């Protein structure tokens, strides 16, 4: 009788010990947040319809990524803080611990995955915006770009793609691509409208927004490539927050929460995804 009680007591104690060791591990991610009770998202509000200021250059940050990251925070029972950050400073801010997550229309890329964890959420791909009539007959990132002038956002994956094509052009004896890199997408658009470049390489969602605002002057080149690229949210490498975010994003996609946000900003909910191949 006493031996049975002893066994039961030991078993209960063992379970309690195991639960005690598991519970803190599950809560560690909250202890590591930049601000207690808040999910801080580094975001570059210069990229409609993904993220932009409600008043153009000031006010509340809105857009698909802003709303989706807010939905994520709500799912995790946290407040959301949108921390406006320059494009080239997004990943450095994350690795320096100034934000918990970077949810702001960044490609899932090997370069970024080398220093951060990525959680895919939307299929996308680059496109080319050109002057109406496409006078240089550019179709995509291909030999059609050799000898042309192309604008890109500096430090973006698209910049890397165009630089790679420039090398291919030159290695095959063709004229290279004159690449102009700008800090902001709006500056690439201004360069195209002012005739300084022949085309802009941007994500498909940005291309659509650019053309919608300049329908009489610009168009999307007929051609597409790398259609299986994904946008991804980034978290510090090896963080306890990563699996939490991944699970929450999967839930928000499966229950239709993020699909409603996509429709709100005229994005295709069929492109929502939880997997992706890095470029």
Role assignments for model-derived ranges:
Residues 28-31, 157-177, 219-220, 250-279:
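Ligand-binding clefts/hinges and TM-proximal coupling segments of bilobed small-molecule sensing domains
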Residues 88-89, 105-114, 163-164, 193, ...:
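A ligand-binding cleft/hinge motif common to bilobed small-molecule-binding domains
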Residues 27-105, 264:
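Extracytoplasmic small-molecule ligand-binding "clamshell" domains
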Residues 70, 79-143:
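Acidic, polar ligand-binding/catalytic clefts
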Residues 30, 60-65, 112-124, 219-224, ...:
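A structural signal for short loop-to-beta-strand junctions that line the ligand-binding cleft
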């Amino acid at each position: 009788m006493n031996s049975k009680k002893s066994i039961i007591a030991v078993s209960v104690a063992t379970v309690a010990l195991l639960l005690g060791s598991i519970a803190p591990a599950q809560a560690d991610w909250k202890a590591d947040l930049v601000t207690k009770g808040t999910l801080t998202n580094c975001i570059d509000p210069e990229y409609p319809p993904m993220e932009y200021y409600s008043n153009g250059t000031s006010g509340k940050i809105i857009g698909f990524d802003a709303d989706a990251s807010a939905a994520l925070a709500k799912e995790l029972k946290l407040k959301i803080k949108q921390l406006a950050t320059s494009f080239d400073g997004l990943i450095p801010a994350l690795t320096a611990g100034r934000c918990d997550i970077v949810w702001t229309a960044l490609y899932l890329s090997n370069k970024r995955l080398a220093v951060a964890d990525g959680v895919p959420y939307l299929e996308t791909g680059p496109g080319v915006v050109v002057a109406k009539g496409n006078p240089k007959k550019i179709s995509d990132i291909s030999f059609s770009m050799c000898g042309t002038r192309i604008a890109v956002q500096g430090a973006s994956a698209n910049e890397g793609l165009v630089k790679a094509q420039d090398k291919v052009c030159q290695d095959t004896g063709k004229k290279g691509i004159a690449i102009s890199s700008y800090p902001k997408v709006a500056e690439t658009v201004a360069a195209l409208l002012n005739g300084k470049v022949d085309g802009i390489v941007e994500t498909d969602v940005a291309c659509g927004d650019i053309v919608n605002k300049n329908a009489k002057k610009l168009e999307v080149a007929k051609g597409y490539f790398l259609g299986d690229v994904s946008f991804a949210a980034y978290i510090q490498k090896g963080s306890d927050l990563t699996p939490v975010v991944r699970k929450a994003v999967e839930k928000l996609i499966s229950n239709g929460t993020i699909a409603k946000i996509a429709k709100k900003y005229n994005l295709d909910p069929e492109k929502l995804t939880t997997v992706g191949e890095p470029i």
